[in-house]
């Protein structure tokens, strides 16, 4: 994911590493960020997004407004980038760990996501806080879904890494938007008598599975 930009002032007494600040709308920062995640997911799973909005106690107007402010924040000229837009809404990360990726070492930061208690929002950063990747991953200790057939690929049930591990060799494909990923993989059907495995494309938004494409 490309580096972000942010024109918001520092949040809290310790700046962007302090507690989460409110969105300009008055919504708590973590709630506003969940609406940002849901806005892109609404393109493929509008019904699930409507259910999520009811769970969060907000409206579609709130969702649109939160996303509009996020996009303005991300594309503001001459604004600081990297982690600051995320920290401004999410506050201090729950965990910060070094992670080795081949010959490179990056920093992995995670935050809880109340809408999905078994997931965490993870950001991988390079030197000087440049954001490499930002997506949803399974929380440590949370049970991952059992993925064996197409019937197990339920929207919002699994992450990119989980599908890639369940159906090797999955081939990464370019997503249709900056927050989307796709994997081409071969997946058995639910009925062994209905033929062999199917070659499919699994599509993800913010790292969470959304739909199958034949």
Language-model-detected regions and their locations in the chain:
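C-terminal structured interaction module
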Residues: 186-214
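Short helix/turn-capping signatures at newly exposed starts of structured segments
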Residues: 2-182, 204-214
């Amino acid at each position: 994911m490309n580096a972000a930009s942010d024109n918001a002032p520092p949040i809290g007494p310790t700046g962007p590493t302090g507690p989460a600040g409110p969105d300009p709308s008055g919504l708590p920062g973590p709630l506003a960020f969940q609406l940002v995640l849901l806005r892109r997911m609404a393109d493929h799973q509008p019904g699930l997004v409507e259910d999520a909005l009811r769970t969060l106690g907000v409206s579609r107007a709130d969702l649109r407004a939160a996303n509009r402010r996020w996009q303005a924040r991300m594309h503001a000229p001459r604004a600081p980038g990297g982690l600051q837009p995320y920290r401004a809404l999410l506050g201090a990360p729950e965990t910060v760990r070094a992670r080795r990726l081949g010959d490179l070492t990056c920093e992995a930061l995670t935050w809880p996501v109340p809408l999905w208690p078994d997931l965490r929002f993870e950001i991988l950063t390079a030197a000087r806080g440049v954001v490499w990747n930002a997506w949803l991953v399974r929380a440590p200790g949370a049970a991952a879904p059992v993925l064996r057939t197409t019937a197990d690929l339920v929207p919002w049930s699994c992450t990119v890494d989980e599908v890639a591990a369940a159906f090797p060799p999955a081939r990464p494909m370019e997503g249709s938007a900056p927050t989307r990923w796709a994997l081409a993989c071969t997946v058995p059907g639910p009925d062994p008598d209905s033929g062999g495995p199917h070659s499919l494309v699994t599509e993800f938004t913010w790292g969470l599975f959304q739909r199958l494409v034949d």
